[in-house]
């Protein structure tokens, strides 16, 4: 259960799915922070809050998912290039350089995980 507080309102939301991964945890945490700052829960009933959230704010969820994926790809590509000797400063990351990952990027990731075990 997530507890939302806005002034005198206290609303409980039950998750129907268990949080299975780290990304879902980040996703739900960002949702909670977003809805604590809006008035969407002010006139809603406690029964259908979760369905209202998913239906009403679908565009927000898609943009949030897009930003999380973009951050992970940017981090992995810069990390792999640093490891291969091509030093890349985090402050000077270019969008054009990051948008085109190296050809053997997936092979490198899989070999990295197999060597670390």
From Swiss-Prot:
Q: What is this protein called?
A: Uncharacterized protein YIL163C
**Source species of the chain:** Saccharomyces cerevisiae (strain ATCC 204508 / S288c)
